[in-house]
Design a protein with these regions (language model features):
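N-terminal auxiliary "cap/dimerization" subdomain that precedes the catalytic jelly-roll/cupin core
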Residues: 1-101, 306-321
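Non-heme Fe(II)/2-oxoglutarate
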Residues: 18-20, 232-321
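Catalytic micro-motifs at enzyme active sites that drive phosphoryl/nucleotidyl and oxygen chemistry
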Residues: 21-23, 89-92, 128-132, 147-153
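A gly/proline- and charged-residue-enriched helix-loop-helix capping module
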Residues: 107-142
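A short beta-loop-beta micro-motif enriched in histidine and acidic residues
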Residues: 137, 150-160, 207-208
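Short beta-strand His + acidic residue motifs that chelate non-heme Fe in jelly-roll/DSBH
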Residues: 151-154, 171-172, 222, 228-238
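Double-stranded beta-helix
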Residues: 166-221, 226-227
Length: 321
């Protein structure tokens, strides 16, 4: 497998691991595209290793579960307890049962997986930074499920290399610039207020998506705020091979940070002054002015939030505490 030759990675087995972008003659950080990789062979990404990872993440509330019966149109809400109260050991013992679903969030909090994320990004770093310098805050999310299962429609702040490790899944992705799918106001609300309440799937959106039917060794790259969702159908599953495992490798850059700051300032213009400001990227000269102002707005919001939290009354400690 060809990789970014400036930074190859080698696992304990001697195998060289990486994401192969050479299948894309014109890879761009601003465009959705398919890709190939071989991280499905990495020892840390096999199901027994992931069960051990889940045991380590569970006390940190980094194992997430969805309620039964969700659809792609459901709100993307999740909890740190299984809806039936199952332990992590039981979750993995029964992971091939239809509609089983667990996500391992922020795997980078475990040092060996933080190192793995660095290896994955090193295999593409020079290609990414040709367009978007200063990669930072690399995070990882692993989704483990048995069909029929879905991940609801949503957007993320980060750019995303999405890698299929085991089983099959269909990933549907829309352009982040398609305002008929997610309005600029909804994107701003997500960036500023962390809310997905106005990011909801409608069946009329489906024809406008790019669909990727992926198996082990396949993947998809999509830019920040690209609407996306997944589904896994039962037709590929057989006893002993009925689990889908996907790895979202997320990262920020100077470009995503700049866009977020423009969204922050646009929110002030829209809500406070009733303006209809240009979205990030539509007016680069204005973005140059908005971004530092948005940085100030964001810092002020965080400070105000911290002050409000500290001012909330707390229960008095018991006598003698």
């Amino acid at each position: 497998m060809k990789m970014d030759q400036t930074s190859p990675t080698t696992g304990r087995t001697g195998t060289s691991f990486g994401i192969d972008l050479d299948t894309q003659d014109r890879f761009s950080t601003s465009k959705i595209c398919s890709l190939k990789h071989n991280f499905h062979q990495h020892p840390l990404l096999q199901l027994p290793a992931l069960e051990q990872l889940a045991r380590e993440l569970d006390p940190l509330h980094k194992c997430r579960f969805v309620r039964p019966g969700i659809t792609q149109a459901s709100g993307f809400s999740h909890a740190d307890r299984h809806p039936e109260g199952r332990s992590i050991e039981e979750v993995f013992r029964r992971i091939e049962e239809p509609a089983s679903w667990v996500a391992l969030y922020n795997v980078e909090v475990i040092p060996r997986y933080r190192a793995l994320l660095g290896e994955i990004m090193d295999s593409v770093r020079s290609r990414v930074e040709q367009e978007q310098p200063d990669i930072f805050l690399e995070t990882g999310f692993i989704f483990i499920s048995a069909p029929p299962s879905v991940t609801p429609f949503h957007i993320d702040r980060e750019n995303n290399f999405w890698l299929q490790l085991q089983g099959r899944k269909t990933m549907s992705v829309w352009s982040p610039a398609d305002r008929s799918v997610v309005s600029v106001e909804a994107v701003e609300e997500f960036i500023v207020a962390h809310s997905l309440r106005n990011v909801r799937f409608k069946e009329a959106f489906r024809p406008g998506s790019q669909e990727f039917d992926v198996g082990p060794g396949d993947g998809v790259y999509f830019p920040s705020t690209s609407p996306h969702m997944t589904r896994s159908e039962p037709n590929w599953a057989i006893p002993g091979d009925g689990v889908s495992v996907s790895f979202g490798v997320n990262f920020y850059t100077s470009a995503t940070r700049r866009a977020a700051r423009v969204h922050q300032f646009n929110r002030v213009l829209r809500k406070g002054l009733n303006f209809s400001p240009a979205a990030p990227g539509q007016a680069p000269v204005l973005d140059t002015l908005k971004a530092p102002l948005g940085h100030v707005v964001g810092a002020a919001r965080r400070l105000a939030g911290a002050v409000l939290r500290s001012a909330r009354p707390t229960a008095a400690p018991p006598p003698g505490a």
